[in-house]
């Protein structure tokens, strides 16, 4: 293997070739594009005719059937494209296609909350080949996206501030290439698990980086090393804000057995995709869910996921927490620094949104060994029961824990407490919570009190105090 790698690098030292295309410019296979340790195999991108990039326009007026548009201004004017709306351009990755359901599903969620031009980029002619070749085709597709955006600006007077590129996997780096060609003037780029092989550790001109747009955010869901984890996504931070949900490596719900993964509820094809790259695909599923859950993906500033799970990163800072996904651009400090890193937990099924709470329970009653659980009730809904502590329950002691609720309970109105130990005790001990304090991630604190104690498995309701 080492000899093969060395041979490939030496082969890359040969004088490079170049290919040029009308309106797009010239592309070389010299370093840093090829012939390096990170990109040992030399290749030139395919022609636009061979890749056959297509732009599929969905709008609020045509949410189910796309209009095919080109970088011709008259063609765009005759479509449902509206210059008084934001434009979000979704770009798929390796082996994928622009007509895959997830892209149009993302558009449809957008139509639920905004009026928008939603363009799905189909470059399957260049993505369904060897990975090495696809990474080179990225450059041409990025140039074509940039050409479309430049026509919007020059011929339709459209502001690049209103352009948002959303790329998955290799699509993230296509967005980066388009951003470079528009000199960072595009309003926003979102990288959905940017592809790692041939990009991690490469110079900024090769990959997505924070200078490619006015604001760049990224979601990392498959950031384990390619060997041995088969992690397809980058662990390297690439934006102003980088989110690592669930630690960024293993996503909840992706550890099913082979049969259950392939015989998926969405069908054999989707199930097979999930089995092969479940973690990698989670990034666009999280983003799609975030569109209709504007407060359900709060990211917490933290130096590591282990500290986050140890409850060392709550609550949000004075500027609040950024929301991973669609509403990340609402964060006041979004461009104050580069490579800001945030952690959060998500659900494991279709509803991925979670709301984090910190609960402090001060015990009363008798000393026993057991588990204490609480459930939250508010004007937005009710949570399940979550365990706060297990061990020796002593009156006067306080126990703190954080949990992620699948319901945003809103402003809290009451809390219910319960304890159990599953041990037969003829004395029938009673335990209570004299005070329960609940803090939301926005720093809002709610206090509840009770003077009562209850036996095992009996609910105790605490009222505001």
From Swiss-Prot:
Entry EC number(s): 3.1.1.3
Enzyme active site: 169 (nucleophile), 193 (charge relay system), 280 (charge relay system)
One GO molecular-function entry: triacylglycerol lipase activity
Signal peptide region: 1-16
Name of the molecule in the record: Pancreatic triacylglycerol lipase
Residues reported in the UniProt entry to bind Ca(2+): 204, 207, 209, 212
Similarity-based family: Belongs to the AB hydrolase superfamily. Lipase family.
Gene Ontology CC entries for this record: extracellular space
Reactions it catalyzes: a triacylglycerol + H2O = a diacylglycerol + a fatty acid + H(+); 1,2,3-tri-(9Z-octadecenoyl)-glycerol + H2O = di-(9Z)-octadecenoylglycerol + (9Z)-octadecenoate + H(+); 1,2,3-tributanoylglycerol + H2O = dibutanoylglycerol + butanoate + H(+); all-trans-retinyl hexadecanoate + H2O = all-trans-retinol + hexadecanoate + H(+)
Record carries keyword Cell membrane: no
Cell compartments where the protein resides: Secreted
GO BP: any one term: intestinal cholesterol absorption
Positions of disulphide bridges: 20-26, 107-118, 254-278, 302-313, 316-321, 449-465
Keywords per UniProt: Calcium, Disulfide bond, Hydrolase, Lipid degradation, Lipid metabolism, Metal-binding, Secreted, Signal
PROSITE patterns registered for this protein in UniProt: LIPASE_SER, PLAT
Organism (species): Mus musculus (Mouse)
Activity regulation comment: Inhibited by bile salts, is reactivated by (pro)colipase/CLPS.
Domain PLAT: 355-465
Function: Plays an important role in fat metabolism. It preferentially splits the esters of long-chain fatty acids at positions 1 and 3, producing mainly 2-monoacylglycerol and free fatty acids, and shows considerably higher activity against insoluble emulsified substrates than against soluble ones.
Subunit structure: Forms a 1:1 stoichiometric complex with (pro)colipase/CLPS.
Tissue specificity statement from the Swiss-Prot or TrEMBL entry: Pancreas.
Record carries keyword Calcium: yes
Primary localization: secreted
Enzyme class: hydrolase
């Amino acid at each position: 293997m080492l000899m093969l790698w060395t041979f490939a690098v030496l082969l890359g030292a040969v004088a490079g070739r170049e290919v040029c295309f009308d309106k797009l410019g010239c592309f070389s296979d010299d370093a840093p594009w090829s012939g390096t340790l990170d990109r040992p195999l030399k290749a030139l991108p395919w022609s636009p005719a061979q890749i056959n990039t297509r732009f599929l326009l969905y709008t609020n007026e045509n949410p189910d059937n796309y209009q095919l548009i080109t970088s011709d201004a008259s063609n765009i004017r005759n479509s449902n494209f509206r210059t008084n709306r934001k434009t979000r351009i979704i770009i798929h990755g390796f082996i994928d296609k622009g007509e895959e359901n997830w892209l149009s599903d993302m558009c449809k969620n957008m139509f639920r909350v905004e009026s928008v031009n939603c363009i799905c980029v189909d470059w399957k002619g260049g993505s369904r080949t060897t990975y090495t070749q696809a990474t080179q085709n990225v450059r041409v597709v990025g140039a074509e996206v940039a050409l479309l955006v430049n026509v919007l600006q020059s011929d339709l007077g459209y502001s690049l501030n209103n352009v948002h590129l959303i790329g998955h996997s290799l699509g993230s780096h296509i967005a980066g290439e388009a951003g470079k060609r528009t000199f960072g003037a595009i309003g926003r780029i979102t990288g959905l698990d940017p592809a790692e092989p041939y990009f991690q550790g490469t110079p900024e001109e090769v990959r997505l980086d924070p200078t490619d747009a006015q604001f760049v955010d990224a979601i990392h869901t498959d950031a384990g090393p390619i060997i041995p984890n088969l992690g397809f996504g980058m662990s390297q931070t690439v934006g102003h804000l980088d989110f690592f949900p669930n630690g960024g490596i293993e996503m909840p719900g992706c550890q099913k057995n082979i049969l259950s993964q392939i015989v998926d509820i969405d069908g054999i094809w989707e199930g097979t995709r999930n089995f092969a790259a479940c973690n990698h695909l989670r990034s666009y599923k999280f983003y799609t869910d975030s569109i209709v859950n504007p407060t359900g993906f709060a990211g917490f500033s933290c130096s590591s996921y282990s500290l986050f799970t140890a409850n060392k990163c709550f609550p949000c800072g004075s500027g609040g927490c950024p929301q991973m996904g669609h509403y990340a651009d609402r964060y006041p400090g979004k461009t104050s620094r580069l490579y800001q890193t945030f952690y959060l937990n998500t659900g494991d099924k279709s509803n991925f949104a979670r709301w984090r709470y910190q609960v402090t329970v001060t015990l009363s009653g008798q000393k026993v060994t057991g588990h204490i659980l609480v459930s939250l009730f508010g004007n937005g809904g009710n949570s399940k029961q979550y365990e706060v502590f297990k061990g020796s329950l002593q009156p006067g002691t306080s126990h703190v824990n954080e949990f992620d609720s699948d319901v945003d309970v809103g402003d809290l109105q009451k809390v219910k407490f319960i304890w159990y130990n599953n041990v037969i005790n003829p004395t029938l001990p009673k335990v209570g919570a004299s005070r329960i304090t609940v803090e939301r991630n926005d720093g809002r604190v709610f206090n509840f009190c009770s003077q009562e104690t209850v036996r095992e498995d009996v609910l105790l309701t605490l009222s505001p105090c």
